Amino acid sequence: MVVSLSFPEADPALSSPGAQQLHQDEAQVVVELTANDKPSLSWECPQGPGCGLQNTGNSCYLNAALQCLTHTPPLADYMLSQEYSQTCCSPEGCKMCAMEAHVTQSLLHSHSGDVMKPSQILTSAFHKHQQEDAHEFLMFTLETMHESCLQVHRQSEPTSEDSSPIHDIFGGLWRSQIKCLHCQGTSDTYDRFLDVPLDISSAQSVNQALWDTEKSEELRGENAYYCGRCRQKMPASKTLHIHSAPKVLLLVLKRFSAFMGNKLDRKVSYPEFLDLKPYLSQPTGGPLPYALYAVLVHEGATCHSGHYFSYVKAGHGKWYKMDDTKVTSCDVTSVLNENAYVLFYVQQTDLKEVSIDMPEGRIHEVLDPEYQLKKSRRKKHKKKSPCTEDVGEPSKNREKKATKETSLGEGKVLQEKNHKKAGQKHENTKLVPQEQNHQKLGQKHRNNEILPQEQNHQKTGQSLRNTEGELDLPADAIVIHLPRSIANWGRDTPDKVNQPWHNADRLLTSQDLVNTGQLCRQEGRRRSKKGKNKNKQGQKLLLVR
């Protein structure tokens, strides 16, 4: 259903001439509404920063909190739609209607530099013209807005559950699990929350504080747990996890003591993008990304003194410092360097549609704390196989090609002809360890009386031993490196594979020979006698010792 909505005339006392002119020229706002619409998580239309707020006397704490709520994307969109005021039966004194008018006036009916005064409906029940805790005012405002919604729902639907747009946006579920250490039985309890308090007494970062929240607590002695299965008090462990993540996450850094109000003024780092998945009771699927959009800051020694201000991210993506009537632009670096009191994050379920964009290609790098560790492990364990089967055509697909007889003399001529082409490749190939092994093998071969073979090499004018690693023969030649005494191979070189042809591809590194697929099979059976190497018709075997 498509509904055309127009905003009512603003209060002249709170509107500047420029704002009135803007309202006269403003077109109607069209939004799509359905019966079961959920609050949007992003700005429907990019908006600039809201106007400054007048300090009526020690009211900086409520101004800072109202600015954060005004720039909460799903709440602002719901307020700008004016959906609630159209169904409210008693708009006078209604906190939801007052907040709707405040957000509409701040974002739509004001010019840059305008200042407005917060409605007394939002402030009178809490503000007594003295400094108060901004977080307490924030939670008081959300609870009273929630109650206003429930009154309307109960009048229209008496059987409806205690749900409201406020809980749909800010609400989540805690899961408290108690486990009996004797019978291992568990008991789960679920509680709603609107904010997540974080103990920062020993935490260096928000992520560490979130982990500390989930630490197991032992229940013993007077605090022992009564187990229904054991039917008596037993030692138990208690853990607390976020079971259902809210659309908007409020993280409250516990800087003030409960009794004296003294402040814990220590630096706690917080990210611009946060992945909440590791902190859920049942983490499944991919990352659960959140983006920072507002920060509430306190300067001073106690919560009842000092000064409050806030940073907000406007609908068009720019950051602003909201300090009562002053609205100044800033960068995200300034925002992340503050000693924050309350952090506001919005869930990003669809990165392509959310206005507070996070680089989609860097999501795992930014959000997943284990991504870099997993990436480094994959690189460490990924090793390239020394086998040459990955070069050229796979062995199972290679065709058996006919070969012709080639003499050593012809091989020498062809080698010298192609030596220049293959020289560059051989210079870049590290064969020093192989050449040392070949020298050792050569000494063993001499001890096994293979002088006739060496004399034959001298007659042909070619020293195969000096050309190991750079022998370049025609594609139809077959070269076999076969030591005379195979039985002594494993005992003489225990660090090598006990198959001489296993290293044949290391002895000949010429790319041309590898691509022909005519090297001897590495997986072949071990041959113990030289006489078994018989020449097939049309082939010339070169036995290299």
Swiss-Prot record:
Residues 51-348 form the USP domain. This is Ubiquitin carboxyl-terminal hydrolase 17-like protein D. Detected in T-cell, myeloid, and embryonic stem cell lines. Changing residue 60 to S: Loss of deubiquitinating activity. SUPFAM superfamilies: Cysteine proteinases. Residues 393-404 have a biased composition (Basic and acidic residues). Residues 374-385, 524-537 have a biased composition (Basic residues). The gene is Usp17ld. The active site is at 60 (nucleophile), 307 (proton acceptor). Residues 367-443, 521-545 are annotated as: Disordered. It is found in: Nucleus; Endoplasmic reticulum. It catalyses: Thiol-dependent hydrolysis of ester, thioester, amide, peptide and isopeptide bonds formed by the C-terminal Gly of ubiquitin (a 76-residue protein attached to proteins as an intracellular targeting signal). It is an enzyme of class 3 (hydrolase). One of its GO terms (molecular function) is cysteine-type deubiquitinase activity. The lineage of its organism: Eukaryota, Metazoa, Chordata, Craniata, Vertebrata. Deubiquitinating enzyme that removes conjugated ubiquitin from specific proteins to regulate different cellular processes that may include cell proliferation, progression through the cell cycle, apoptosis, cell migration, and the cellular response to viral infection. One of its GO terms (biological process) is proteolysis.
